[in-house]
Amino acid sequence: IKTSESEGHQKDAGILSVEDFVRKIKDYDVISFDIFDTLIFRPFSSPTDVFYLIGEKFDFLDFKNLRVWAEWDARMKCRQKNGHTEVSLQDIWENLEEDTGLNAEEGMRLECETEEKLCYANPYMLQVWKRLQKLGKRMIIVSDMYLPRSCIERILQKTGYTGAERIYISNEYGENKAGGDLFHRVIRDFSGARIVHIGDNP
C-alpha cells in the first residue's frame, strides 16, 4: 500500500465520475476500503452525536459525555494492560455499567441497533463498489472501529455492500490503520499483491 497513491485516490473520489474513478483503481490486485465516512455515512456532524439518541432512549441526561469518557477510559486501561488502545464495544459498556448502573448487554444492543438504523450508503462509493464487483475485483474492508463484527456486517448488508473478501476490524486484532499495524497485517495476508486503500490512514 503506497501512502501517496492512496491519498491521491481518496482525493479523486467524488471529483471524478464513477467510471473514471473505477478506471484509476481497477488494475490493482486488491482494493481496500475504509467503512465510515467512505462507504458509509452517518446523519451527524460528529460520530458521537449518536450518543444523544441513545441517552434519550435510556432517559439519561448526560449520557453523551459519559459514553465518550467511558470509551476514553477503556482505551487507557487497554493501553496499560495490552500496549494498545483498540477496544471493543463490550469494553466500553462494561465501563459504563460500572459507572452508571446501565445494563451493558442492553446498551450494546441499543447502540448497535441505533447505528444500523441510521447509517446509510455513500451513493458515489456504492456505485464504485458495484462496478468493481461486476469486474470481479477482490475487495476488502479495513476499519478502526469498536463496533462488533456482527453489527458492521449488518450495516454493510443493509446498505448494499456485499461480497467483501475480508473484513479487518481493529478491535479484533489490537491493531489499527492509524498506526499502520493493521495495514501490515493486510500486506502479509495478501503477500505480493498490489493493494490500494480508499479512505483515511494512509
Spans of features found by a protein language model:
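Hydrophobic, small-residue-rich alpha-helical packing segments that form membrane-like cores
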Residues: L118, P123, W129, I155-E172, ...
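Conserved Lys-Pro-Asp/Glu-containing loop-to-beta segment of HAD-superfamily phosphomonoesterases
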Residues: G179-P202
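Non-catalytic pre-domain segments flanking phosphatase-related domains
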Residues: I1-F33, R194
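Short, solvent-exposed loop/turn segments at secondary-structure junctions
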Residues: F36-I40, S45-S46, M145-R149, Y173-E175, ...
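Short, acidic loop-to-helix structural element flanking the phosphoryl-transfer center
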Residues: G14, N82-I141
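N-terminal accessory alpha/beta regions
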Residues: N65-W93
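Substrate-recognition/cap helix-loop segment adjacent to the acidic, metal-dependent catalytic center
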Residues: T100, Q133-I140, M145-N171
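Active-site neighborhood of HAD-like aspartate-dependent phosphohydrolases
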Residues: F21-V68
